[in-house]
Amino acid sequence: MQNTLLRTYINSPLEQFEVKTFLGLNTPFIDLSGLNITTFTLYTIIVLLVVSSLYVLSNNNNKIIGSRWLLSQEVIYDTILNMVKGQIKGKDWGYYFPFIYTLFMFILISNLISMIPYSYALTAQFVFIISLSMIIWLGITILSLFKHGWVFFSLFVPSGTALPLVPLLVVIELLSYVARAFSLGLRLSANIFSGHLLMAILAGLTMTFVQINIFTLILGFIPLAIILIIMCLEFGIAIIQAYVFSILASSYLKDGLYLH
């Protein structure tokens, strides 16, 4: 019974989302648990190293013809640049483009690294992603208040609203605005979490199925093909969700800058 429970725990599809401690820092006098080296810390460093390595590899060394790494970076750069320009008009886009581009690259690389089997998904951590989206939302709100002052609150009163409907619409618009802080990150985290959970469950069922006998071993290639198809879809979702997160952040930033 104990061995069965142990196998169930080890093979749990949710185990891939657990934060495990590699190096704990504890003293009898001071609580240093916040400095522990965990899977979250390790994969954050890996993401930063991969992003930095991409820029090193894309260094053209003054060559006329760019390398494939450089071309790939230029495609990503131009895509995000055009997206930010489309959202934020005028000259203001230049101030916020580095932030949106960095945000996109971090989420994109985090999503792609999480597609490696037995790896850790940073963006599937609800606390981290929702905290990130709340910080972005709070920063945009402070920026808008600093730029517009009391006029900022006109954002919650749609133009042309009849006076008797103003209190109701203000409450609705306020709730909608506050919900952005959660929906921005929840959308990303829920998609990555559900996709990885689905692949883990299907992989576990397939592994159990092919171990029954030789006949099921042969038939096991069918669910394996399905898993590979789902994995390809997850790669697409990983890229799309990074772009969606960035474009929504740009859209919210536009609303804060121009109050519409």
Curated annotation (Swiss-Prot):
Residues 1-11 form a propeptide. Keywords: ATP synthesis, CF(0), Hydrogen ion transport, Ion transport, Membrane, Mitochondrion, Mitochondrion inner membrane, Transmembrane, Transmembrane helix, Transport. The chain crosses the membrane at residues 37-57, 96-116, 126-146, 152-172, 192-212, 217-237. It is a multi-pass membrane protein. It is found in: Mitochondrion inner membrane. One of its GO terms (cellular component) is mitochondrial inner membrane. GO terms for biological process: proton motive force-driven ATP synthesis. NCBIfam families: ATP_synt_6_or_A. Mitochondrial membrane ATP synthase (F(1)F(0) ATP synthase or Complex V) produces ATP from ADP in the presence of a proton gradient across the membrane which is generated by electron transport complexes of the respiratory chain. F-type ATPases consist of two structural domains, F(1) - containing the extramembraneous catalytic core and F(0) - containing the membrane proton channel, linked together by a central stalk and a peripheral stalk. During catalysis, ATP synthesis in the catalytic domain of F(1) is coupled via a rotary mechanism of the central stalk subunits to proton translocation. F-type ATPases have 2 components, CF(1) - the catalytic core - and CF(0) - the membrane proton channel. CF(1) has five subunits: alpha(3), beta(3), gamma(1), delta(1), epsilon(1). CF(0) has three main subunits: a, b and c. This is ATP synthase subunit a. It comes from Candida glabrata (strain ATCC 2001 / BCRC 20586 / JCM 3761 / NBRC 0622 / NRRL Y-65 / CBS 138).
